[in-house]
A protein has these predicted regions:
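A short, acidic, amphipathic alpha-helical segment used as a generic capping/interface helix at domain edges
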Residues: 49-66, 84-87
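Glycine/threonine-rich flexible loop motifs
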Residues: 78-84
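Peripheral docking tails and interdomain loops at the edges
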Residues: 86-126
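Conserved beta-strand positions
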Residues: 72-75
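Redox- and metal-dependent alpha/beta enzyme cores, enriched for Fe-S-associated oxidoreductases
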Residues: 1-50, 54-57
Length: 126
């Protein structure tokens, strides 16, 4: 829906997106098991509390890609991302000073119309 309405997706920050490649395991560490554990525990995932690493990553990505607005897409079944969307929205709008839209989907065809309407309106205000 974003591309179909003239927008450009510059980064996909979720469980299968950029965050998997952000922090690699330090292969030179003396304690390789500790380095592996450190890498996994520092992933900015919504199940981590506090989740400062996700905010830090989002801030870097917004700056690096010169983002005009954030569409935070979460799956209906991912309750931790849904709960965190309010604080992410506050971070994006107040700390980074750009518009934010939170959308929830189950990837069904029934969602297409609503998502298209919401994303079109969001892109028009950018």
């Amino acid at each position: 829906a974003i591309e179909n309405n003239g927008g450009v997706v510059v980064c996909y920050e979720n469980c299968s997106g950029y965050k998997n490649f952000d922090r690699l395991v330090d292969a030179e560490a003396d304690d390789i098991i500790g380095a592996i554990a450190d890498r996994y525990l520092k992933i900015g995932c919504s199940v981590m509390t506090p989740n400062k690493n996700r905010y830090e990553l989002l801030g870097r990505l917004i700056d690096q890609y010169n983002v005009d607005g954030v569409v935070d897409m979460s799956l209906t079944a991912c309750l931790t991302y849904n709960i965190e969307s309010k604080s992410i929205g506050k971070f994006v709008t107040e700390e980074k000073g750009i518009p934010y839209l939170s959308v929830e989907t189950d990837y069904s065809k029934a969602d297409v119309g609503q998502l298209n309407t919401r994303i079109t309106a969001f892109l028009e205000m950018l």
